Design a protein with these regions (language model features):
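Nucleotidyltransferase catalytic core that binds NTPs
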Residues: 1-180
Length: 180
């Protein structure tokens, strides 16, 4: 957050990922919301169910609604290097890139995949140096910056494989949802 000078981060928990098999690849929505809230506690990260409430299925549609609803706010899309490798499979990914700047956060083991990704081929014309990332509010989209951060070798995929029932501890009906 500091590298980008962000006031806060909105963590949009998706009710469903069109690129994943819901039954196999995703834990129940309520458990993912509760888990995200636990991880974001006491931070400037706001966990949101906006996508569920908006009824959107695709990120580009969600972002259009967010930009309409909060026209005076400045937004930057944060994504991990692991996501860049499949970004070209997202609905209207070029349109998404034209909506707001993108910051790509380093992920151990994904640097080569991210740099070789089909979407990166198109986005290479819009790359901004990481040292200028704090000035992202001055950028016109499309704009993308690849940020090198201290490595976090935690792999959510590996953690889920080690404990397939991890989400059960977050399945309490008492947990609420935060609405930005």
């Amino acid at each position: 957050m500091d590298r980008l000078g962000l006031d806060e981060v909105w963590w949009l928990v998706s009710p469903g990922n069109p690129l994943k098999d819901q039954a196999v690849d995703m834990a129940p929505y309520a458990a993912r919301m509760a888990s995200a809230r636990t991880m974001a506690r006491h931070s400037r990260i706001k966990v949101s169910d906006f996508e569920l409430r908006a009824g959107t299925r695709y990120t580009v549609d969600t972002l259009r609604q967010i930009l309409r609803r909060w026209p005076r706010h400045r937004f930057i899309w944060l994504m991990g290097e692991d996501t860049v490798a499949q970004f070209h499979q997202w609905k209207d990914w070029r349109t998404l890139a034209r909506l707001l700047p993108i910051a790509v956060l380093s992920r151990p083991g994904y640097d080569d995949d991210a740099r070789a990704a089909r979407a990166t081929g198109w986005l290479r014309w819009f790359v901004r140096p990481a040292r200028q990332a704090v000035n992202w509010t001055e950028w016109s989209a499309p704009a993308i910056s690849f940020l090198r951060l201290p490595p976090d070798r935690t792999s959510a995929t590996r953690l889920r494989a080690l404990n397939p029932d991890w989400h059960r501890r977050f399945s309490s009906p008492r947990r609420g949802i935060v609405h930005p």
